[in-house]
Amino acid sequence: MIGTPYTEGARRAMLLGCGELGKEVAIELQRLGVEVIGVDRYPNAPAMQIAHRSHVINMLDAKALRAIIELEKPHLVIPEIEAIATQTLVEMEAEGLNVVPTARATQLTMDREGIRRLAAETLGLPTSPYFFCDTETEFNQAIGKIGVPCVVKPVMSSSGKGQSVIRDVSQSAKAWQYAQEGGRAGGGRVIVEGFIPFDYEITLLTISAVNGIHFCAPIGHRQEDGDYRESWQPQAMSADVLAKSQAIASKVVEALGGYGLFGVELFVKGSDVYFSEVSPRPHDTGLVTLISQDLSEFALHVRAILGLPIPNIHQHGPSASAVVLVEGKSKNIRYQGLADALAAENTQLRLFAKPEIDGRRRLGVALARDKDIESAVNKALDSASKVKVIF
């Protein structure tokens, strides 16, 4: 049962993290009459701007997180980011709190070690070789065992922060220092992974719902500096490789438990599929589904977490997204060129309304459909390039 916002019977959902993905989740929640409470570490975050009300707290502060949940008494807590005091969610879930998809899933995927050990050691899924390291000595030993090229990531980081590829051992010291600076909790543990010379990488959006496991068409994407620049759907792949990908995604999602949409990242090399990472929430590469599907990844996530069935997911054809990425410093961000950006057929634009920029930041995404993937990607890139950001 869903009530009406601001009434005694309202169904209340609390978003922990109010970025651009949380904003789209909030919109879908409101379309189904859910009262939305936004929580983030800074004011006027994108989802806060449309939530029924919002709070600013340090979500890594266990006491502050517990206090705001006890104050609002939400029926659902929806983590949108990793930087959260997840042990508090585990404790409160045991007390009856409904965490989406589960507190365990949120905790396991908060750091790369938990989810990698689940996938490789518990589920026996194919992954790249890896070592976890606490010291620079262990780090150098791991590189010696794995060899170069290899990939280095802080176990707790996002959006490519602290991530680098070592192509020569002379780069080791610099990579260690960069990883120590890029972790969410400051310096600390890192993962060293063997580099898989993959043919392509995909995000397989996988939904666990009351009526079973469902998949969106595979999404291809291009990464740069550890963050996505373009994504497209569908990624061309053989039926055999798709079946292998879906089998891996199903195992991971079922092991994590709960209802919701999961972004499962996979590497494909020939007919082999390797597990990379998983997010127990909508994925940034899945922004393409805002134009490529009748139900976006956000609509699917909300249906699933509300206990509603997932119908057949219709994919509209070759579609792409391209980010509007800007570097600068301002608290007065304005946009020009929108008419040019939207002049072509089957193009859309999402400006995230982030309140400020200090360095490099993703401020929007251009979306496009066309006759084939290459044309759709080029159209999205052209649209994004016409958005002029004024500081």
Swiss-Prot record:
Span of domain ATP-grasp: 117-306
Reactions catalysed according to its record: N(1)-(5-phospho-beta-D-ribosyl)glycinamide + formate + ATP = N(2)-formyl-N(1)-(5-phospho-beta-D-ribosyl)glycinamide + ADP + phosphate + H(+)
Pfam family, one: PurT_C
GO cellular component assignments: cytosol
UniProt: N(1)-(5-phospho-beta-D-ribosyl)glycinamide binding residues: E20, L21, E80, D284, K354, R361, R362
GO biological process terms on file: 'de novo' IMP biosynthetic process
Pathway: Purine metabolism; IMP biosynthesis via de novo pathway; N(2)-formyl-N(1)-(5-phospho-D-ribosyl)glycinamide from N(1)-(5-phospho-D-ribosyl)glycinamide (formate route): step 1/1
This enzyme's EC code(s): 6.3.1.21
Subunit structure: Homodimer.
Listed NCBIfam families: PRK09288.1 (NF006766), purT (TIGR01142)
Full protein name: Formate-dependent phosphoribosylglycinamide formyltransferase
Organism, scientific name: Shewanella sp. (strain MR-4)
